[in-house]
Each structure stands twice: as structure tokens, then as C-alpha cells.
Amino acid sequence: MKKFQLFSILSYFVALFLLPMAFASGDDNSTESYGTVIGIDLGTTYSCVAVMKNGRVEIIANDQGNRITPSYVAFTEDERLVGEAAKNQAPSNPENTIFDIKRLIGRKFDEKTMAKDIKSFPFHIVNDKNRPLVEVNVGGKKKKFTPEEISAMILSKMKQTAEAYLGKPVTHAVVTVPAYFNDAQRQATKDAGTIAGLNVIRIVNEPTAAAIAYGLDKTDTEKHIVVYDLGGGTFDVSLLSIDNGVFEVLATSGDTHLGGEDFDNRVINYLARTYNRKNNVDVTKDLKAMGKLKREVEKAKRTLSSQKSVRIEIESFFNGQDFSETLSRAKFEEINMDLFKKTLKPVEQVLKDSNLKKSEIDDIVLVGGSTRIPKVQELLESFFGKKASKGINPDEAVAYGAAVQAGVLSGEEGSDNIVLLDVIPLTLGIETTGGVMTKLIGRNTPIPTRKSQIFSTAVDNQNTVLIQVYEGERTLTKDNNLLGKFDLRGIPPAPRGVPQIEVTFEVDANGVLTVSAVDKSGKGKPEKLVIKNDKGRLSEEDIERMVKEAEEFAEEDKILKERIEARNTLENYAYSLKGQFDDDEQLGGKVDPEDKQAVLDAVEDVAEWLEIHGEDASKEEFEDQRQKLDAVVHPITQKLYSEGAGDADEEDDDYFDDEADEL
């Protein structure tokens, strides 16, 4: 059946559906089952989790005591690592250590910037039906993961961090995304949450969340602020009005592919070229050497925020040769100046879109670790002619705001007077005759929103129309991003231009789009599309499978942890026995020489067993060895106590069981 495109025939009507509060109110019955809702900043390079309790926001430290966690996942021969542990071993395991996954989520393999990303990653990216998948070695076998699955592993780490702090399970979360993330990237982020065992009840734009962190205590007079959010991999600018707890986004712009990683890569490439030229080699082919260089360049960049120069030293960098170069702040700025200046374009755009002058901006809020770069601050402050605000922590502000949003949704104390009115970042529309982009909802429209428009058929007796949905600012659809498409069938035969087909776009508070179409004659079957599968999104079956696999990984992690704990318990016990029975001032001087030797021999047997089987033994085997050791020791200590030796009855026995986590 031939399909034809649409053309607009009537002036459209608007049914603007804007709730007075973009947040769910605290007394909404639907919030009762949420429990504690956490706020997660799922960053390109670092992630952060926070919670609102008793009117206060707590940034939650991870198991290493750090308030931000590297967005890294790694696979070794026998375990999966997430966070610091994954990042620390990255230089020695580059092909199986995944980072910057946010640059892949919700994207197609054939996108323009994808080839550049793939070239810069030490791990393998493969094409699966135009979806980028990460291929790594897991337990000696090749395994492919979607970006959603890797992101889910990071979200799961954040979930576990929150649960350890709260002492109870967490099932609901607010997760932030760059304001300029498109529909596919937002949906993919929600899917990642589902795989991680989290119901993502709201997606919040990162600069908007940061604005909450900035303006929560500023309720006196209306302010216009610009949030300049330059993170590890993405860049957003939002212009907001803040007035008595109402946060209204007036305009947003940005670049989902610009951030600190790009600055690092420029320096890495510069230093690699310099090293190659001096030594007549090609170090870029050595992934481990490049991993070491990446690690040191990131450190150097941070140092240059407070120093004018830094010495980069790497022992045994390549072919046994050391690396030693000085990097000055001036050189760093020279290498990246075009990227720094590029960040001012979106700033100009939000001023233009909101019809505000520079002089009408009350404050500039810096968010994201890359805003610590002195030249970035200098360019921005020069543009506005005023100093930027440094009153909030750029690494934690987004998670802070997400936690406040979470508090509102769950009805937490102190959150009832907060209202957030966000906007969509890109124009939404459909393709009509001639490949024209007919716009239904313009960019920077407040959400949630709903808009309808009447279209008709292009030829006589047309009974099916193809509705193609796009996002973007260009006149022709070929220059914009296709979100999805569907057919409206069963239109009664009629001359061209007679049927009335109502197309409705609805954007929810998460910025997620639903499109519906209906023949106004009432004879055609209504059709509805939640934009998803046409962009390579995960199907429900995919998500269910990945949830199951994530649970299996969690079970494997649990088994591994228990095995390690059992081994540590055995080693600690044997070590304590050896120390006690080797020392004549302790138990060694209180037992018969034969008994002493029996214990020391048993300890030696355990040490030899650990040497042979320690890497492969199961939890049960470690526990069995402990019991065998007990069988030797217990009768001896019992005999000692029955003879009156030892002043504290079972104190010595308790001592052997005294364990502490080893660093």
C-alpha cells in the first residue's frame, strides 16, 4: 500500500496543557509507595548521589569515603569493578575498562561524532543494527553490552551507596541529564535506571537541578540567572528566573559532545605527537601507555587550575622508556582555546531566545568540574562584565538539586514551596509535503505541554498516511533528527484536502514525547506512538533480559565478596594463631610443646593450601579449612582452660575470631 506524506491545510489550534507545578505535589497519593527517593547525577566522568531528609540535603559518600564516584566499569578475569576500583586499574586493563559511556547512550552508530569517539576509546565498539555496543572480555569470553547496561552498573553503584547510608532499600530515583539531551538519550537513561532496579520517576535537566541548589535559599526578589554547566563530556547553558521558590527555565542551549574529556584528548594527542617526534615511535598503538598518559593528563589539568605549569612524569612509559614533559597553563589554553570560545555561542543563544540583555542577568552560576579552568571563567566573566558566582560546589550541585526534586516528589519536609517549570530543548514537528519540517512545539516551550494541529491527505482517496516525527531547528526534515514514524490507516476515501487528521504532540515533565493521530471523521482507528523503537531504543524484552543479567551480575558480585571475606577470615585466623602460639609470652608459653607444634603445623598446612588453592577456592572450601584448623586448636585451648591457664576463660578464643577489614 502506497504511503503519502501530509500537508497542513488549516490554521492549527493549540491546547496548551501546563500544570501550575511541574513537580508532583507532596500530598499526591501516588507518592506513598515511593519510600525515600534519591537524586542521582549520572555524569560522563563522575557520578554523585544525594538524598533529602528532614528538610536538608545530604551528599552521600561512597565506600571509599568520596562524595563523587568515577563513572567507570571494568571487567577482570574473575570480577566486575565499578567506580574507583575500575578507574584505578584502567591503565593496566584498557580494553576492558569502560568510561565516558554517557557519550554513547541513546545514540546511533552512524552519527557524525561517533567515529571520532570510537577512535579515542581503548575499548571496542561494535555496530549492532546501528546501535553502538561495547565489547569486552568477561571471564575469558567476548561479551557485548549496550550503553544502557553499562550506565545501569553505575546507577546500581549509586543505589548501593545510598542504601548503605540510609540502611534500607531504595527503589525510586530522580536522575539528571544534560538539558540538550534529545528524546532518545532521555529514554535510554530511564531504561538504564530500570535495568539497575530503579524506577526513574523524573528526568531533570542538569542546569535546572543546579539552579535549585543555587537558589533554594534565595527567595526574596526575582532573579535572572545563567547556569553555565561544563562537565566531563557535555555542556549546557540555561537561563532561569527564580522568584519565591519558583524556578522557571526561560531558555536552554548547549552541546552534548563538549567537555573536559575533549580538553584532555587535545592535550593527550599533543603530548603523544611530541613524544613520537622526539623518539621516532608511535606510542598511540600501545593502549596501556596511552592509558597511563590519560591518567596523568587528567591530573595535570586539575593542577593547572591552581598552578602555572606542571611536570608530567611516567616511569616505563613505552618500551621501557620514561616519559617527562612540562605542560604550562598557557600551552593548555592555546591547545583548547577554540573549544573554550565555542562555549560562548550557547550563552549568546539563551540570551537571544529569552529576549534578555547581558545587563539583566543577576548571577552566573558555574557547574561542572571543567568550570574550574581559569581561562573558562575569564572568558565568561569578560563576556558578562561581572564575576561568576562560586557559592555552590560544581561537582555536587546537580545531585543536590536532583535530591530536592526527589524530596518534592516524595513529600519530604521543606520541599512544599518549590516549583520547577522546565522547557524542551529542541523544536518538535512532523514532515509534510516536500520534506518540510512543520513545527508543532517550539524549543524552550515550558513542559509539560500538549499541542494539536489539523492535517489532511495529499492525494485523492488516500486511506493511509505516514506520520514522521522529527526534532531540530532546520527547515527541511533531512537536516533534523528523526524520532519515529507510524501509519494512520483506515481513512475513508475522499478528495485530497477533505479528511481532517488531528496530530497531537504531548511532552511530559520528563521531556519525553508521545505523538497521537486520529481521523476526525471517527471512522479511522486512532494511533499513538511513544517515541522509542525507531531510534534503536531497547524493547521491553531487551530491558527485561538486561534486568535479569544485571541481577545475575549482582549475585556474582555477592558470591565473589563472600568468597573474599571467607578467605580473609581464614587468613586472619591462621595469622592470629601463628602469632599467639609462636610467642612464649602468650599461648606459646602456656601449652605443651607437642600441642604448640600441632597448632603451628596445622597453620602451616593452611598456608600451603592457600598458596595452591587461594585464587580458585569457593567460600565453602575456605570455611572447611577454617573448621579443620578449629578441630586442631579447640581441644588444645579447652585443655588449657580446664587446667586453669588463662584468666579470661574464652577470651583467647574470642581473640582469634576478632576480624577487621583489611585495606
From Swiss-Prot:
InterPro entries cross-referenced by the UniProt entry: ATPase_NBD, BIP_NBD, Heat_shock_70_CS, HSP70_C_sf, HSP70_peptide-bd_sf, Hsp_70_fam
Region (Disordered): 639-663
Primary enzyme class: hydrolase
GO cellular component, one term: cortical endoplasmic reticulum lumen
Sequence segments annotated as region (Substrate-binding (SBD)): 404-504
Keyword hit for Signal: yes
Signal peptide: 1-24
Family: Belongs to the heat shock protein 70 family.
Name of the protein in question: Endoplasmic reticulum chaperone BiP
Organism ancestry: Eukaryota, Fungi, Dikarya, Ascomycota, Taphrinomycotina
